[in-house]
């Protein structure tokens, strides 16, 4: 791993450890916005009650918990993630549930002697600097007849909830996205995702596209939630802007959201 990717991973881990509690509170217990994909993902991999499942980059356990509900007494699901805080939350959230475990593991550096029937990975592949390494680890963890289910965001232009702020943020805060950060948009098309997965040795690949609508409320709700939930390093960069620039930034975001907020969908 080159040094710039190593720095990115360390920085990203620190951020996830900070935001995990807020992220969990806001998203993982609801079936709204992007998390409508959880149900779709599990439906597509067709979990059998006796399956052993690996959930890669499980975060605070949203997908893992959903999988566990599909399993019988002989089934088992293991959630893995690099964030110690996310894993701690996942364990607490699932402390009464049986036949599941959570372990601190880097998706780019793991191997299991035992093979799984299904591997899932929701909204994480694009965060891995070496996505190929992570995918090959997942493939090596599968039984020969096993299935992998992956969810990724579409291209940011098709995800206005993110692009409305990100496009303006990178204009007003030039280092908003630090050096070494992988292109989070790189698997946002069917062809790009299929090419990457095939390169890792997978076959019989099926890509499905879904649209999940989300109503963030009025613009002030959308904006205030952005300020409330962003990580400390980004908030510090925002607060370092002159007041006039912060106002310009906010107005630029508002302008971008008009076409969506009028429809109450973003």
Named regions from a protein language model:
Residues 2-51, 62-66, 86-89, 93, 149-175, ...:
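Conserved class I S-adenosyl-L-methionine
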Residues 2-8, 22, 26, 31-35, ...:
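Conserved Class I S-adenosyl-L-methionine
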Residues 12, 30, 34-38, 83-86, ...:
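Conserved donor sugar-nucleotide recognition element shared by glycan-biosynthetic enzymes
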Residues 52-110, 133:
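Class I SAM-dependent methyltransferase SAM/SAH-binding core
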Residues 108-119:
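A short acidic, Gly/Pro-enriched loop at the edge of an enzyme's catalytic core
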Residues 117-131, 154:
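A short SAM/SAH-binding and catalytic strip from SAM-dependent methyltransferases
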Residues 132-147:
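A short glycine-rich, Lys/Arg-flanked "PGG" loop and its adjoining helix->strand segment in the class I
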């Amino acid at each position: 791993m080159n040094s710039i990717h190593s720095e990115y991973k360390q920085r990203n881990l620190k951020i996830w450890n900070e935001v995990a509690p807020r992220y969990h509170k806001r998203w993982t217990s609801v079936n709204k916005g992007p998390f409508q994909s959880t149900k779709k993902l599990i439906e597509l991999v067709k979990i059998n009650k006796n399956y052993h499942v690996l959930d890669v980059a499980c975060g605070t356990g949203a997908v893992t918990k959903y999988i566990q509900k599909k399993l019988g007494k002989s089934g088992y699901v293991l959630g893995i993630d690099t964030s110690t805080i996310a894993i701690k939350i996942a364990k607490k959230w699932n402390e009464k549930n049986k036949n599941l475990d959570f372990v601190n593991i880097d998706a780019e550096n793991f191997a299991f002697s035992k093979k799984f029937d299904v591997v899932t990975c929701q909204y994480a592949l694009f965060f891995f600097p070496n996505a190929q390494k992570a995918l090959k680890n997942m493939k090596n963890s599968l039984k020969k007849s096993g299935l992998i289910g992956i969810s990724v965001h579409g291209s940011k232009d098709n995800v206005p909830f993110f692009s409305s702020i990100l496009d303006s943020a990178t204009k007003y805060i030039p280092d908003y996205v630090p050096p070494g950060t992988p292109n989070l948009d790189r698997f946002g098309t069917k062809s790009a995702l299929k090419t990457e997965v095939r390169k890792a040795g997978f076959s019989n690949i099926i890509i499905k596209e879904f649209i999940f609508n989300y109503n963030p409320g009025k613009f002030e709700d959308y904006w205030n939630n952005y300020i409330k939930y962003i990580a400390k390093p980004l908030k510090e960069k925002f607060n370092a802007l002159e007041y006039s620039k912060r106002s310009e930034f906010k107005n630029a975001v508002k302008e971008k959201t008009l076409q969506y907020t009028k429809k109450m969908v973003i």
